[in-house]
């Protein structure tokens, strides 16, 4: 498989976000502020089932051979989140089944909780010979880190671990402990040459911010290989659509308010696109009346705080 034949949807969204930032702000501080506001502001929710009557017609013609009767859906738990896959077509069940196996394979390969994964081996030993797919994610992660001046950084893992977001044993770290751990955080500590991954200065990595985007692209590729023209996946807030709905209308994705509840910031109509956002209100803890969420600023080691 040539992994450069398709772009990771997660990467596309993050790169577009950062391009906007870079065009308007040449200074690191301003760029970081905008990124924090963007990241903390949104969380996407799929509305394909509940709001199907309102979609606009797209350029795609309504399918005469595919209908709701050709639908197959399945839910799984992987990559520490709940996922939903839906496909329409004669081979919909086969496509979803194969896609689920692929998700599970990638989860095992990228997971920091799997002792046999490339990531865990590198984190434990400081180096590892990695697979094509792991190498691809490392390369793309480093590219994003350079484009964002370190606002996106896969070496944030030790800080996430310190806060307890990886184990759910939450705590506010001591300031001196946090500063010491931050010394290990820098994408410049990561090097890759000919599939040899090296982590310097006791750095450790985690693909939590990029793996689901790559995975959703793989699912879309599998759907296409099985002749699926209409489909949707929701990988824990990473929503990607294939074609339109079977009636020719666009898929509808709501952007949920960061305050939670049933409030939405807006609804996007989309086809053959991904909608990926992140919000701090679903993964957080409270201590002494203060809420701490999981979107950590690599510069400070503390949860990102919007103005």
How would you name each of these model-derived features?
Residues 5, 10, 14-44, 48-307:
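Mature catalytic core of soluble alpha/beta enzymes
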């Amino acid at each position: 498989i040539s992994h450069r034949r398709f772009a990771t949807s997660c990467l596309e969204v993050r790169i577009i976000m950062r391009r906007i930032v870079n065009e308007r702000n040449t200074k690191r501080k301003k760029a970081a502020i905008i990124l924090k506001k963007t990241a903390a502001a949104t969380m996407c929710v799929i509305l394909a089932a509940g709001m199907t009557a309102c979609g606009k017609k797209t350029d795609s013609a309504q399918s005469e051979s595919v209908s709701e009767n050709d639908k197959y859906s399945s839910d799984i738990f992987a990559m520490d989140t709940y996922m939903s896959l839906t496909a329409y077509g004669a081979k919909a069940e086969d496509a979803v089944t194969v896609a689920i196996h692929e998700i599970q394979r990638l989860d095992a390969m990228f997971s920091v909780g799997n002792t046999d994964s490339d990531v865990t081996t590198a984190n434990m030993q400081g180096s590892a010979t990695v697979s094509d797919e792991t190498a691809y994610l490392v390369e793309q992660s480093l590219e994003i880190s350079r484009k964002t001046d370190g606002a996106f950084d896969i070496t944030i893992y030790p800080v996430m671990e310190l806060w307890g977001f990886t184990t759910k044993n939450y705590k506010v770290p001591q300031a001196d402990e946090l500063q010491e751990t931050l010394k290990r955080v820098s994408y410049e500590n990561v090097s890759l040459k000919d599939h040899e991954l090296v982590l310097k200065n006791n750095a450790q990595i985690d693909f939590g911010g990029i793996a689901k985007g790559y995975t959703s692209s793989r699912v879309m590729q599998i759907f296409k290989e099985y002749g699926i023209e209409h489909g949707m996946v929701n990988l824990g807030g990473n929503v990607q659509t294939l074609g339109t709905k079977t009636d020719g209308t666009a898929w509808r994705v709501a952007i949920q308010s960061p305050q939670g509840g049933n409030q939405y910031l807006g609804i996007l109509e989309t086809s053959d696109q991904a909608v990926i956002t992140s919000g701090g209100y679903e993964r957080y803890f409270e201590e002494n009346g203060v809420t701490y969420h999981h979107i950590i600023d690599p510069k400070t080691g503390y949860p990102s705080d919007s103005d």
